[in-house]
Structure formats: C-alpha cells, structure tokens
Amino acid sequence: MSLLEKINEPAAIKKFTLAELDILAREIRQELVQTVARTGGHLAPNLGVVELTLALHSVFDLPRDKIIWDVGHQCYVHKILTGRRQEMTSLRQFGGLSGFPKRAESPYDAFDTGHSSTSISAALGMALARDLKGEDYQVVAVIGDGALTGGMAFEAMNHAGHLQANLIVVLNDNEMSIAPPVGGLAAYLSRLRTDPMYSRGKEELENLLNRLPHLGPRVLKVIDRLKDSFKYLVVPGMFFEEIGFTYLGPIEGHNIARLKEVLQHARNTRGPVLVHVITTKGKGYQPAEDHPDRFHGIGPFDPATGEPLAGGGPPTYTSVFGAELVRQGEKNNRLVAITAAMPDGTGLTPFARRFPKRFFDVGIAEQHALTLAAGLAAAGMHPVVAIYSTFLQRAIDQVIHDIALMELPVVLAIDRAGLVGEDGETHQGLFDVSLLRCVPGLVLMAPKDEQELRHMLVTALQYQGPAALRYPRGAGMGVPLTGTAQPLPIGKGEVLRRGRDVTILALGPLAYAALEAAGDLAARGIEATVINPRFIKPLDEDLILTWADRTGHLVTVEEHVLAGGFGSAVLELLARNGRKGIRVRCLGVKDEFVHQGKPAILREHLGLTPAGIRAAVQALLAETPVLHRRRNQTKGISGG
C-alpha cells in the first residue's frame, strides 16, 4: 500500500516521518501528472507546491486553522490530502471537482478564490473576525510572487501591518520575481532570523547591555544602526519589515523539514508574518520544469512526452486577433498594446516581439492597465487593452471614469467572453455586456466568427472613442480568413436568413447555432429569420424593429447573463417604441453562476444549442395561435 492510500484526512500526515513525507511528495507528483494528463488543468503550479502543502498540513490543524490559496489553481495537492483524492478524476469536469478552492465542496476550503491577489484581504478579515469573537485559530494566506504584483495584495498587507493582526502570509516565489538573497551571509542571517533562539538571544543581549552604566545604551544604538544598514544590504525582505511584517526567509521550498520548522516559528510569532518560500514551478516533471508557462494551464496531454493530445482545427479567436493587431501595428505607429500579465493568453506575444517598445505588460494590475491606456490615448497614442472578460470586472471604474468620460479612443479586446469551460464560475465571461452597455459613448461589438473579428478590430481602431469587442475562448468557426480587414458601419447588423414566423437575434458565434436551428425549424414548417446583431451598443434599431413587426416574435440568444444583457437591450428597445404586441423569449444565463464543464456541455445545459434554440422558438410560437399570427403579419419579408 502506498503512503498516499493511507491518508483519509490531513491529520494522518502529522504522524509521518520526514523520510515518509519525502516519499509521499514523490507519490503525489506522480498522481498529479497522471490526473492532469487526463483532465487538463494547472499542472506546473501544483507540482511546485507539493512540499509546501505537506508542510502546511503538518503544522496547522485544518479545518480549524484556515488556509486561503490565492488564485487557487495550486490547490490540487490540498484537495488530495483533504479526502477528495478519489474524485480527482472528475477535476474541472461538469458536475465534478472544481479546479479551485470551493467552500461548498469541502470544509477544508476556507475561502473561494479564482482571481488574483485577494487572499491577504480575506485572511485579514478572518483574523479580525476571530479576534472579535474571542476564538483561537491560525489564518494563513498562500500567495505567489506574480499575484503579489496586484495592488490589492499590498493594500491588505499595509492594513495588516498597521493593525499588527495575527496572520501568516506564505509567499510562494516560483519565478524569482523578488530579488534573491545575496550569498552565504544572507542565508546565515536568514537562518538566525527564523530560529526561535534569535529572538530570545537578542532580548538577553539588550538586557545585559542596559545593565552596563553609560556604555550599554550607546552600544545598543550603534548595534541598531548597524543592524538596520546591514539588513538593507543583505536581507531581501526589508520592505515587508517596514510595513509591519516579521519576515522569515527566503526558505528552500522543497525541503519539508525546513518548511515545517519555519512555519512552526511563524505560528508562534505574534503579529503579521511573511514566510518567503522559493519553489520551482513544475518541480519533479521534466517537461513542466523545462516549460513551466506551457504547463501552467494545459489541456489533456501524453504524460510520457508532455505533448498535447489535441491538435489541429481552425485558428483560435485569440490568435486571429493577435495576428490582425500586428498587421494594424505595421500601418499605425501610434498603436500600442497592453496586457495585465497575460501576453500569451491574450494573443499579444507576436505584437510584443514585433513592437517591443509599443507593448506594455503591467502585471496583475487591471485598474492600472486601463488608466495607463487612458493616459496614452490622452497623449495621442491609440491603445488596445487585451483582457479576459472576467478580469475586466476589476477595472470598470477606470473604463467609466478614466476613459469614457473623456471619450478617449481606447480599444478593449475582451477575450474569453462567454463560457470559458473548465475553469468554472470564477472565470466565465458572463458579465461584460451588462457592465459596459450602460457606459455612454462606448461601442460594443460581438463577432459571429474569426473573419468578422478582424473587421471589428479595424472598426474599433477607426472609432474616435472607446470601443470594445467581445469574443470567445477557443477555435474559431473555420471560415476563410481572406482579404484586408475592413471597418463595419457602426450600429448595423446583418440578416443571415429570412423567414416569416419568427426572428432569431443570436449574438456572436451563436449565430451559427441559430442558422442550424432555423434549418431544423424549416423542416417542421416554421420559417425563421436569423439576424447577426454585430453591435450590442448601439443596436441596429431599424433592423430589429422592422423584423419584430414582420414576424411578431423574437428570440434573443447570448452567452451572457440575461440581466442587463443583449436580450435586455432588445426588450428596452421594444418598450421604448411601443411594441407591446411583440412576443419575446430571451435565451442566456439566468440568475445563477455557471460551474465548470466543457463549453459544449454547458451550452447544452443552458439551452444554447441548435436544439435548445429550436425548442424555444417552438414554445414561443405555441403560445400564439397560428391564425392570429398570420393575421398580424401584414408586411412582406423582402428587404431589411
């Protein structure tokens, strides 16, 4: 029996020897590789925190003590140790385990995460609640060096240092973003500062010197001055000390004995403590160590080689956007591109290579990214901010206050709009339309395919104000990418198919699902008009009202929440224009969060498939007698 099979609860590992914990770490790595090879997921981050997670579970008493995993994608080892090992085959699958911590899933998950830089704020809140209620437990936030670039993390640390709250922050430094220690002396000083004997010895020395008349206090002052100067020279954690944290580290993050020793010391230290741990992303699996970025988040792969199993197919929307942006950059030397720590994910890497001086990666700082773009635009440049829909949520005030109020020409390229799939509710791009549709002067578009995406990028770049285009994750529709991208007339949709019984307004690539549904309906004697709206704001009001009058029935379809979404915009249009007799059904996401699963499965679950659209049309028409429908259709179907 393997050691891993002996673990029914995390307390079991407290009895393991250090040698057994090292063996357990190897077993966990092997299981991680095999599991993620089947399900896909965040492999490299989890391989890097195996020993750290074992040490945390050895020192702290979960679930009484609380561990909050920043971002949360590095929680797989934690899930294995907390009774979910048998369910790991369902990781990130529909109805299975989430790829992130989830309070509803386990009492061992103290706080839901998915976005970056939130853990320290949450940990501080829990620590304050503990103290106000007179309870006694430890609160630990585990945050990566990348997440520490987020301003929210520093806001929380500043507040924690001011309050001198009892909490522990573990800095998982896996890319050496923070300066490494300087030589053996720094390591020696770090060793002293993590040893409980250091604090006691320092106090005893001070007491001894204070008993010496005249000489003692003077020596202490000299020692303090030397100590302060010395610390800034050789210890890389003095920033944290200055804001009120006790800094412990840097620590070898794959040495379980050392990790346990330091974490125990942190547990016994009053006030906020930062434990700086150096880890290797992808540790123990050579392909992931060689290519940690590629294995940060990966689909199913061959564990023997590390090569992805899936391949081929149409280019992704992201890659088409990136290629077109480079073409536009060749024509316009005022065009600049901005990302918030996602150059590969947003398709900006080719632009960065071609125009390094016109590319800016701001780190995990979405608010700064948007206002940086505003400043660039105000000074005569034309910025494009490529950002995931879910992360744009963090910078809506900047869109309104810093961009739209001044009508600045900033382009928002909103990637991962709609259902993103296996990353689940924290990453679905289902709120951007509601958030942006209300912003005065902003143009909002959604392409039906990758060719139209090219045209919309050019349209956005030619618009003299804020413009946004939202497009999904994954492969395009496979349409030919031909010719030079041309601007589209703003606020004009297109009719893809004409019919007399019902009008289907399908946003983005769902236009193709609507066309398929229309074909199925035609076989059943129902004639449907299918419209690609193209523009969510401004709507093509004439086109929509014309076809609403002709057919008397509208179905809107969108990969977005219904509240405040595209369907809401259509309903508002009808109400403003007194179209009380038009019957409407809106398809989209109701008042719920959408959990993880493959996008195709999620669309089926939500009724956003050809079959779902067909059923919605049939249900809508069933509410109105055929004779009454025909009498109300007083206009022909030509034109429009």
From Swiss-Prot:
Pathway annotation from the record: Metabolic intermediate biosynthesis; 1-deoxy-D-xylulose 5-phosphate biosynthesis; 1-deoxy-D-xylulose 5-phosphate from D-glyceraldehyde 3-phosphate and pyruvate: step 1/1
Annotated positions binding Mg(2+): D145, N174
Keyword set includes Lyase: no
GO BP term (any one): thiamine biosynthetic process
Cofactor: Mg(2+); thiamine diphosphate
UniProtKB keywords: Isoprene biosynthesis, Magnesium, Metal-binding, Thiamine biosynthesis, Thiamine pyrophosphate, Transferase
Gene Ontology cellular-component terms listed: cytosol
EC number: 2.2.1.7
Entry's cofactor comment: Binds 1 Mg(2+) ion per subunit. Binds 1 thiamine pyrophosphate per subunit.
Alphabetized Pfam families for the sequence: DXP_synthase_N, Transket_pyr, Transketolase_C
PROSITE patterns given in the database record: TRANSKETOLASE_1 (PS00801), TRANSKETOLASE_2 (PS00802)
CDD domains: TPP_DXS (cd02007), TPP_PYR_DXS_TK_like (cd07033)
GO molecular function: 1-deoxy-D-xylulose-5-phosphate synthase activity; magnesium ion binding; thiamine pyrophosphate binding
InterPro entries: Dxylulose-5-P_synthase (IPR005477), THDP-binding (IPR029061), Transketo_C/PFOR_II (IPR009014), Transketolase-like_Pyr-bd (IPR005475), Transketolase_BS (IPR020826), Transketolase_C (IPR033248), Transketolase_CS (IPR049557)
Enzymatic reactions: D-glyceraldehyde 3-phosphate + pyruvate + H(+) = 1-deoxy-D-xylulose 5-phosphate + CO2
Family recorded in the similarity comment: Belongs to the transketolase family. DXPS subfamily.
Function according to Swiss-Prot or TrEMBL: Catalyzes the acyloin condensation reaction between C atoms 2 and 3 of pyruvate and glyceraldehyde 3-phosphate to yield 1-deoxy-D-xylulose-5-phosphate (DXP).
Subunit structure: Homodimer.
NCBIfam families reported in the protein's UniProt record: dxs, PRK05444.2-2
Descriptive protein name: 1-deoxy-D-xylulose-5-phosphate synthase
Phylogenetic classification of the source organism: Bacteria, Bacillati, Bacillota, Clostridia, Moorellales
